[in-house]
Amino acid sequence: MNRRSFLKLIAFTTIFLSFSLVSKSNRIVRFEHGIASGDPTPEKVILWTRVSSNSDNSILVFYEISNTVDFKTIIASGKKYADRRKDFTVKVDAKIPKRYRGQKVFYRFRAEGAYSQIGTTFTLPKDVENFKIAVFSCSNYPAGYFNAYDSASNDESIDLAVHLGDYLYEYKQGEYATDNAIRLNRQPIPNKEIVSLSDYRQRHAQYKSDVDLQKLHSSMPVLCAWDDHEITNDAWKDNAENHQINEGSFSLRKRNAIKAYYEWMPVREPKTPFNNWKRYKIGKLIDLKLLETRISSRSKQVNLNDHVSDDGNFQKDAFFKELNNVQRSLLGNQQLDFIKENDRDDQTWNLYAQQVLLATLKLPTIPDYIID
């Protein structure tokens, strides 16, 4: 079965099963936000979903993994409660039996008679000659173009997706890149700049409701890193350009954003929440490091306008003094040590996935007829 046929099958399965009426207590359970997998290792992979219901009580959710799409043989399974503490999201670090590692497997969730759609995933292969990665970033729901996710999900040649950050944006309607949101029926939810934990959860839920994004997540593992907009624009360790005094503590806002991020994303959580850098070894072909460049160690960005005097003169000496200050940091010593320790010469490719542009980026003008 190819990926296109599989996606048609799970689309039907979703319609038929995920809206089942269930339980003797008349509770309705649905999987409205899809399923996802991510952070594969040679032995394990993260599986994610979110359960919606007409009750605030906890829900016991089961996961099943099979080597066939009909699930006649279950090769791994388990259960976990979904509750209010994590916004009814469920995340499991599933161990794949040895004989199936590095191969495509199928997974699904069920709760009280309702089934999620079926997803495909895998653990990292130990031996591979070719491996294709789709890269995404800066995905703003009100602006549209999430059909790129759909295109990737239908491409049989793609093995893995990487999202480099700005998976979502914090703005309200009328602000950045919301010009076509009303016409496209993609206005931000909630219609405010997100600050509280509830705000961030609602925004994640809106993004995960997008059908094209759901297709991507169900079709392959996705490696995810955050940039600034998962918190707020131009964030650094201690503050952000788009954080005002009347929005409360930036430290609290950052914690709210990252808590919601870990709840809603198929990522393995590190012991220190902000230190979200990781390594993925894909056979002897690729050693991929996913870096964190925003909120663990980043110093405040140098602002050119801060070094222009009232009479319009550029204060060059002061600018370069700040720019070249040896105390300034982007990655921090701990992450730099991680990079040095894992800079390998036994891999064909050493890849660094991160959010900072290293060259000029020029974007073409998109004609109006494409938008329409």
Feature names for model-found ranges:
Residues 3, 8, 19, 24-372:
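Metal-dependent phosphoester/phosphodiester hydrolase catalytic core
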